[in-house]
């Protein structure tokens, strides 16, 4: 149906690397119709699916598998990150060593925040275990704060791929922190549309696996 609106969303973490995943090529197949594309945190995207504003979303946060059908697209590393020249209060070897550093976290409803909260909780820690906590809802601002040496954070390697490559940010090596999480295409549970979303998922996987095209242009 070329007139049907394709309404979908991705989380803020995923949107940071989503254009690099060749989303344009995926969307080209639906250029004859209308597209509604949203970027929000996991909680808000799931609410928009519930109210039928979105057909599906790509999320990294947790969701109720009794309510939603899903297809796993990929699994991504969740890593501690800081500025390349960040000066730590002490030698860093394990997660507990970071507690003397200021922590930057995402807003309530963020899948990234929930994952970090769960990891800390499994070890009987909380955000308050850190020296100070700053809550920022924008990943771009978070990156700038990191580059300025304002603290450390935990996020998906994909979201800072460029910064890690260029050397403005670095992964903090920890001997006791090895976390990966699934990115999934999620929609309201129904037996009628699984084949349709399975096809979408395969198209997305293909787009995500295509190499980035570097253009020699100045912006």
Locations of the language-model features?
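Immediate post-signal peptide segment of exported/extracytoplasmic ligand-binding proteins
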Residues: 1-6, 96-100
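Central regulatory/effector-binding core of bacterial HTH transcription factors
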Residues: 3-66
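Short, well-ordered beta-strand segments
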Residues: 5-9, 57, 81, 104, ...
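A late-sequence structural motif
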Residues: 18, 170-213
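Hydrophobic hinge/microswitch elements
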Residues: 41-45, 50, 60, 125-171
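Flexible hinge/capping segments at coil-to-helix
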Residues: 67-108
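Short beta-strand->loop
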Residues: 69-79, 165-179
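Secondary-structure junction motif
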Residues: 103-124, 194-195, 201, 211, ...
């Amino acid at each position: 149906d070329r007139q049907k609106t394709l309404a979908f969303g991705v989380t803020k973490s995923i949107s940071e690397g989503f254009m690099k995943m060749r989303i344009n090529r995926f969307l080209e197949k639906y250029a004859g119709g209308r597209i509604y594309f949203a970027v929000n945190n996991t909680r808000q995207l799931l609410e928009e699916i519930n109210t039928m504003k979105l057909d599906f979303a790509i999320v990294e946060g947790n969701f109720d598998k009794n309510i939603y059908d899903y297809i796993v697209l990929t699994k991504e590393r969740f890593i501690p990150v800081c500025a390349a020249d960040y000066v730590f209060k002490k030698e860093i070897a394990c997660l507990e060593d970071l507690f003397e550093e200021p922590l930057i976290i995402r807003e309530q409803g963020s899948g990234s925040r929930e994952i970090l909260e769960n990891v800390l909780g499994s070890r009987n820690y909380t955000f308050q275990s850190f020296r100070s906590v700053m809550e920022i809802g924008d990943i771009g601002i978070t990156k700038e704060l990191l580059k300025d040496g304002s603290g450390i954070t935990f996020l998906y390697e994909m979201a800072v791929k460029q910064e890690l490559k260029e050397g403005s940010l670095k992964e903090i090596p920890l001997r006791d922190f090895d976390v990966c999480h699934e990115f999934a295409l999620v929609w309201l549970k129904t037996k009628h549309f699984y084949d349709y979303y399975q096809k979408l998922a395969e198209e997305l996987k293909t787009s995500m696996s295509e190499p980035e095209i570097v253009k020699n242009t100045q912006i």
